[in-house]
Amino acid sequence: MNVLNNILVANNQQPIPLYPAQNKNRTKTSIFYSNDVHGQVPKMQRLVSAAEHTELEAQKKGSDILKLSAGDTFIGSDEKRNAVGATFLDIADFDAAALGNHEFDITASICGNLLKDLDTKILGMNLNFPSNKCNLSQKVMRSTIVEGDSGEKYGLIGVQPSDLESRIKRKEILEGITSDDKEQTIKELQEEVNKLKKQGLNKIILLSHEGYHVEKEIAQKVDGIDVIIGGHSHDLIEGVEEGKNLVYSPSGEPVIITQAGRDGNYYGVLNLEFDEQGRVSYVQNNVRDTNFFSPNLLMTNIVDKMLGKSPVIGNLQSVDPIPKNNLIEENPWADLVSDAIRTRLDADIVMINSANFRGSVDKGTVTERDITSIFPFNNKLFKVRISEADFVSAIKTCAKKTMNSKNSKPGLMQVSGLEYTVTKSGDVTEIIFKDKQGNKQSIDVNNPSKDKFYTAVYDEFLIGGGDEMDMLKREDKDILERYPFDKDKVTIDYIKTLKQPFSVHKDGRIKIIQ
C-alpha cells in the first residue's frame, strides 16, 4: 500500500488556493467521482478498491468524503450486466448518482427495479414523469442533502441530458418520461439551488450528464453551484485550469467542473476546502488510472455469483494502451476485432464505428466476459455487397464530422482490409485496400468506383444508417448474410485460435497528419 500511495502522490496535481486563509473554520472535503463507466464490469471491480482507498485517505486527513457518479453506470440491454452496475453503486457506497442516457437502454421500469433498493440517492431534477407514474419516479429525486462526518451538510442536485429523447433507441423505453430542454433546465437549476440555500445549505454540488459544454454554460449562468461532477461528453479533465474547469458564477464565485473520461479507465479525487461562506477556497483535482488498483475481492465474488464464472480464452502478453480519446485515433482493440471478423466471416473489408468500443482488457488472463464487456450494445452483424463509392463516402463522412465536432463524434471508422490517412481538419487524403494475401491497391478517394463491389461486414447500427451513415443502408438483395451474434462472439472464437500468449498492437492502418 505504501508503494501505491507513493505512486498516487507522485501523480497528484498542484493544489490551487482561491481565497486567502482569513480564518481556520474551513471544511475539508474529498469527492471520489466517476462518470460514464458504461457497464465495464472489470473496471467496476477495480473502482471499488479505488473508492475504499480514497475514503481511507480522506479519513486520515480529517476530510468529509463524498462518492458521486455523473451517470451512465449502465449500458446496453443486458439486464444482468446492468444489475452488476447497480450492485457496484451499492458496494462502493456511492452517496448519489445521476442518471445518464444509457440508463435508458433498458425500459424505465426495469431501470427502476434495479435501483429501487439502493441506499445511493438517484438524482434527476430535469426529468418529467407521466401522471401514471412508473416505479422509477419513486426512486428519482430532484435534489438531496447529505451530511459529512464533520457535521457539515452538502446539497446535491442531478440533471440528465436535455436531448435524452434523441439518445435512445425507441421512445417507448422512456414510458412517457421526458427531459427539460437546456434553457428550462438552467432555469429550474437556479430555482432548486435557491431552495437549498433557504434551508441553510451553502455547499452545493451538481451531478450532471449534460456534457462539458453545457456544464460550463450552467456554471456561468447559475448562481450558487460550487462543483459540477460532469459526464456524457467523455472529457478527461485533469488538474484545474482557469477558463476550462475553473470558471465563475454570475456573482463571481468559483465553480469547479470535473469529468473522468469514459469506460471506467479513470476516476477522480477532488480535494476541496470551503470557507465559512461556502466558497471553494482551495482545490486539487487528481484524475487517476483505475488500473493502479487490483479488483476488489468482494465485488469480484459477487460478480461471479451474478454472472457466473467466466471461461478463460487466452493470455494477453502485451497490449497498446487505448487512446485517451478513442474516437479520433486508431484503436488497438478495434484492429484485433475487425481482423477477427474479417478472418472468421471471410469478408473483403470490415467497418466498425469507434463508439462501439467501450473499454479494453488488461494484460494477463483473458476471459469471455472481458471481451463481452467491450461490446455492450448487442448489435448483430451483417455481410453485405457494397460499392467502393459507398464505403469511401462513409469513411470520408465520419472523418470530416469527427475532426470538426466539439465532442469528436461520431468517431473515425475503424477498419480491416483498409488503410487510410486523414488530416486534422478531416480530409481523407488516401485510402488503400489490402487483400487477404497482403497485396495493396490504392483507391481514388476523389473518384471512387460506383461499379466495383466488395464484401463487407458491419453491424445493424450502421446498416440502419446510424450516425447519419445513409450510404451504408442496404437493400435485401445486397445483404449476403445475417448473423445472429455481435462482435464479441467472433472475437472470442478468434482469440482461441491464436498462438498463446497473444498481443494486441496498432499497426498504423489509420494515420492522422497535419
Predicted feature residues:
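Acidic, metal/ion-coordinating pockets
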Residues: 8, 12, 18-292, 328-333, ...
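Catalytic centers of hydrolytic enzymes
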Residues: 27-28, 34-40, 260-514
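Intrinsically disordered, serine/threonine/proline-rich low-complexity segments
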Residues: 3-7
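Short intrinsically disordered, low-complexity coil segments enriched in acidic
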Residues: 1-2, 94
